[in-house]
Design a protein with these regions (language model features):
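Generic structural signal for short, flexible, solvent-exposed coil/loop and linker residues
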Residues: 96, 129-131
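N-terminal helix-rich structural modules
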Residues: 1-114
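Acidic/polar surface patches and capping/hinge elements
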Residues: 103, 107, 113-114, 118, ...
Length: 141
């Protein structure tokens, strides 16, 4: 995104979540981009369906993992909190500040559980805390 100089193109890329136009069969609208990859960075670009199916790992189908290659070319599952550790730390730091400002006990509980969820990729408790909130004026997704 930082390399896009045209403000309209940058805004459109933000809306489209990338350089491909979702309303025009995912054709690239920026020069220098080819066909949109099927794997969208959740998997190695060169992975095949057969290779994925043969990959024996209990975490490979998790909603909270990406698949990467080891140095030897073999596949591995990487949890989001590991793959995106710098971003997760930043998110958690901001949420910790929000906890100190939260006046509603339900919101405070939710934020504390969400911080833990970001750190562990186990979101059930925070999702349940979200559903238990009744009076919060904040909608956080």
């Amino acid at each position: 995104m930082d390399t896009i100089t045209d403000s309209y193109a940058k805004q459109f890329a933000m809306i489209q979540y990338g350089a491909w136009d979702r309303l025009d069969d995912n054709k690239p609208f920026l020069t220098g981009y080819g066909e949109k990859p099927d794997v969208c960075n959740y998997y190695p670009l060169d992975i095949t369906e057969a290779e994925f199916n043969a990959f024996e790992d209990a975490d490979k189908d998790s909603w909270y993992t990406v698949i990467r290659r080891n140095d030897d070319g073999s596949l591995k599952s990487v949890w989001y909190h590991e793959a995106y550790a710098p971003e997760i730390r930043q998110i958690c730091a901001l949420l910790e500040k929000a906890v100190t400002l939260a006046e509603d006990p339900g919101l405070k509980n939710y934020l504390e559980k969400r911080i833990e969820a970001f750190k562990t990729d186990d979101y059930l408790d925070s999702d349940l805390a979200w559903m238990d909130m009744k009076d919060s004026k904040v909608d956080f997704v």
